[in-house]
């Protein structure tokens, strides 16, 4: 089941491009915290051509504090995934609904982008980092996590 979901999410992210820039569709106010376990990473660069590495082959860490907060109609805050995505002014795509949270940020000057999607039901998170966007030799890291919601303590 996770492999099927991973493939669907991966295809969705890979087909997702800057033509959707400025897309904002925040349908719900959310304030969620997750603890996410690294599952695998796919690397595409001059050394690896979409090679998959399992969590135990990587130095990458789990996400202990991944937080999402949205406020209708257009605010989305991300914390704990990457410093780049934590800068909410960089977000060009923000989608929040009952099923998924999807976001993308880009820096044209640095030729760099990051995007991610989390399935709110399954907890599957896919984070894509793209370097050298404008080049034929763009580089990608696609990281898969399995996340569980953290209960808020009152």
PLM feature segments, named:
Residues 1-26:
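Classical Sec-dependent N-terminal signal peptides that target proteins to the secretory pathway
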Residues 24-52, 147-148:
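Tryptophan-anchored aromatic micro-motifs
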Residues 26-35, 95-106, 123-126:
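Short, hydrophobic/aromatic-rich segments at coil-to-beta transitions
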Residues 35-44, 106, 127-132:
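Generic short beta-strand segments
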Residues 51-88, 124-131:
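N-terminal glycine/threonine-rich, aromatic-flanked beta-hairpin/loop signature
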Residues 71-118:
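Contiguous, well-ordered beta-strand patches that form the walls/edges
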Residues 113-120, 143-149:
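Hydrophobic/aromatic beta-strand elements that line small-molecule binding cavities or substrate pockets
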Residues 129-154:
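Edge beta-strand at a domain terminus
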């Amino acid at each position: 089941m996770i492999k099927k979901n991973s493939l669907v999410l991966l295809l969705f992210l890979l087909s997702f491009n800057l033509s959707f820039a400025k897309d904002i569709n925040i349908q719900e106010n959310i304030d969620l915290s997750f603890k996410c376990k690294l599952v695998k990473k796919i690397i595409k660069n001059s050394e690896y051509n979409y090679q998959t590495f399992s969590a135990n082959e990587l130095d990458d860490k789990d996400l202990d504090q991944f937080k999402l907060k949205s406020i209708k109609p257009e605010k989305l805050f991300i914390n704990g995934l990457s410093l780049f995505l934590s800068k909410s002014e960089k977000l060009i795509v923000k989608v929040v609904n009952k099923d998924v949270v999807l976001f993308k940020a880009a820096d044209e000057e640095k030729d760099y982008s990051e995007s991610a999607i989390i399935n709110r039901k399954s907890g599957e998170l896919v984070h894509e980092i793209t370097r050298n966007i404008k080049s034929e030799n763009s580089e990608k890291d696609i990281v898969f996590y399995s996340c569980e919601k953290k209960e808020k303590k009152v």
